[in-house]
Amino acid sequence: MELLRTITYQPAAGTKMCEQALGKACGGDSKKKRPQQPSEDGQPQAQVTPAAPHHHHHHSHSGPEISRIIVDPTTGKRYCRGKVLGKGGFAKCYEMTDLTNNKVYAAKIIPHSRVAKPHQREKIDKEIELHRLLHHKHVVQFYHYFEDKENIYILLEYCSRRSMAHILKARKVLTEPEVRYYLRQIVSGLKYLHEQEILHRDLKLGNFFINEAMELKVGDFGLAARLEPLEHRRRTICGTPNYLSPEVLNKQGHGCESDIWALGCVMYTMLLGRPPFETTNLKETYRCIREARYTMPSSLLAPAKHLIASMLSKNPEDRPSLDDIIRHDFFLQGFTPDRLSSSCCHTVPDFHLSSPAKNFFKKAAAALFGGKKDKARYNDTHNKVSKEDEDIYKLRHDLKKVSITQQPSKHRADEEPQPPPTTVARSGTSAVENKQQIGDAIRMIVRGTLGSCSSSSECLEDSTMGSVADTVARVLRGCLENMPEADCIPKEQLSTSFQWVTKWVDYSNKYGFGYQLSDHTVGVLFNNGAHMSLLPDKKTVHYYAELGQCSVFPATDAPEQFISQVTVLKYFSHYMEENLMDGGDLPSVTDIRRPRLYLLQWLKSDKALMMLFNDGTFQVNFYHDHTKIIICNQSEEYLLTYINEDRISTTFRLTTLLMSGCSLELKNRMEYALNMLLQRCN
């Protein structure tokens, strides 16, 4: 049953049903009703089914107990089955751990006995076929599937904070800022699906999953289908009753507009704690849906009312597009948090919570925006966000990574536009040809260099900085030119620690580029070419006017000429600590004996960020999938670390790659990284 419903005698209104089941519900004997069983808190029990497939009726899952240790017959990989996460019509979803690397998945396990009929197996195959091709930040990631004699196993992204249905069950209603936060992510994922010409057809709270970082992922593709032209659309009725659109009920087919209708139902439910068309029986619910008849409480503000009303327009053509939704006043005129605390899963957030960080940002906002004392208030359903808060939000928002101008080309909704294919210059290529190739490959956006003059377009660096870059480029190029072809990464992996950039902020439109190292040192390379670091003790500042010239002073007693820069350094430190996640799983090690790292040069293209440090550490972060390459020198030996899109790291000796080769995905990134390094002063 779907979650949010007052205790009524409505028969299982949240259950996914096919046309046959819906027909019986509409035309059957309405006297045969069974009361829903409330949970301990007085709310109806939710049947949350992570990635549950389409089903006709509820089935029990009695049968042979699934083994604790499961082996993929094809690869020989061993998995450990954990706790049950949810149940569907054909399947149960379990926590499942890959015993080779301890990666945790959500595994949908479907007994062959449940899909013995051809049309049942066809549904599972169709779901796998659609889902395995999808890759988006706000869509549950499909990883792998296999089968043995007893079951089919589908390995999906594990979302530790369960679903929006669980959150709403605990919270009853959400605040407007939270609804904006979640809806933005739903719209992002749904826009990607529609661009792939895929209809979800079962958007509801139980199919929005939340990961550890409070990021939302659209899941459950059991009812998903390819978008067909209007005249070729199938007329079957499928979905969850409370979220069905008028055109689907009227057997006119399911289009993108039908997903928009369901999104309107979702927004209404988040804000008010119940679906808009809920009634005491299914027949009346369908009558209300066909007439688009529902109540709009006065507690909602005008922008929220207007957006809901537009999405729940009876005529599909009158509903807004996903782009229209994001441009609506509900989003433009209201406060949206950059991130949510995990406490929001069970507690109303206090966006006015007083804290040292909040007070710090208050002062920062006052300094940057003139210290206005405007007391005008912005009212929403649950919060009053003052002008002061809007200024703080503006500061936080302004500190976000500068967005890259989108190019008019087709690409994934969460990706930056792709540059042309990279070309690594081989031996024998002339310097002129080399520069031309790299110029074609890398589309530069912005850069910063230690000791440079911000008013000059030339790259001003001394010979030492040039030699650091040349050494890294020579080593990386030598590896790429001589390593053999391979289709996987080497098995030999190292366990070592080194410093790398875990967080970064590009605020070069005002101040400069900020970053945090894995030992919690925070650095800023200012636009005027000076570099300043706040050490992990948060008490000591290192200042470099140029390479090798270091001044050291206390953060609380900075020389007068450095006070403004120390203030900005602290802004960056607070912002990254409060708002940004670490970019990988490498250990954080603080070793005071190690030489201090400071940034020599950073460079952004339309695809990646490059950072070069004084000791030759070289890091490239790729925007679209959050993968990273780090090259460093330890004990006169070069190491390369690759952090994949799941933030899992592997470290190799470059000599190992030179002998064994590597996967194409890693090689392509190494080539692009080399091109960025060679391009850095062009």
From Swiss-Prot:
Disruption phenotype: Embryos display a delay in skeletal development and retarded growth. Embryonic fibroblasts proliferated slowly and displayed a delayed entry into S phase. Mice display loss of dendritic spines and impaired memory formation. One of its GO terms (molecular function) is ATP-dependent protein binding. Changing T236E: Mimicks phosphorylation state, leading to increased activity. Its EC number is 2.7.11.21. It is found in: Cytoplasm, Cytoskeleton, Microtubule organizing center, Centrosome, Centriole; Cell projection, Dendrite. Catalytic activity is enhanced by phosphorylation of Thr-236. Residues 500-578, 598-682 form the POLO box domain. CDD domains: POLO_box_1, POLO_box_2, STKc_PLK2. It is an enzyme of class 2 (transferase). Changing K108M: In DN mutant; Loss of kinase activity; leading to disrupted Ras and Rap protein signaling, altered spine morphology and aberrant memory formation in mice. Its main location: cytoplasm. Residues 25-67, 403-432 are annotated as: Disordered. One of its GO terms (biological process) is positive regulation of cell migration involved in sprouting angiogenesis. It comes from the Eukaryota. Induction: Directly regulated by p53/TP53. Induced by serum and phorbol ester. Pfam families: Pkinase (PF00069), POLO_box (PF00659). The active site is at D202 (proton acceptor). ATP binds at L85, G86, K87, G88, G89, F90, A91, K92, C93, K108. Keywords: ATP-binding, Cell projection, Cytoplasm, Cytoskeleton, Kinase, Nucleotide-binding, Phosphoprotein, Repeat, Serine/threonine-protein kinase, Transferase, Tumor suppressor. Activated by phosphorylation of Thr-236. Once activated, activity is stimulated by binding target proteins. Tumor suppressor serine/threonine-protein kinase involved in synaptic plasticity, centriole duplication and G1/S phase transition. Polo-like kinases act by binding and phosphorylating proteins that are already phosphorylated on a specific motif recognized by the POLO box domains. Phosphorylates CPAP, NPM1, RAPGEF2, RASGRF1, SNCA, SIPA1L1 and SYNGAP1. Interacts with NSF; causing NSF dissociation from GRIA2. Interacts with CIB1. The POLO box domains act as phosphopeptide-binding module that recognizes and binds serine-[phosphothreonine/phosphoserine]-(proline/X) motifs. PLK2 recognizes and binds docking proteins that are already phosphorylated on these motifs, and then phosphorylates them. This is Serine/threonine-protein kinase PLK2. It comes from Mus musculus. The gene is Plk2.
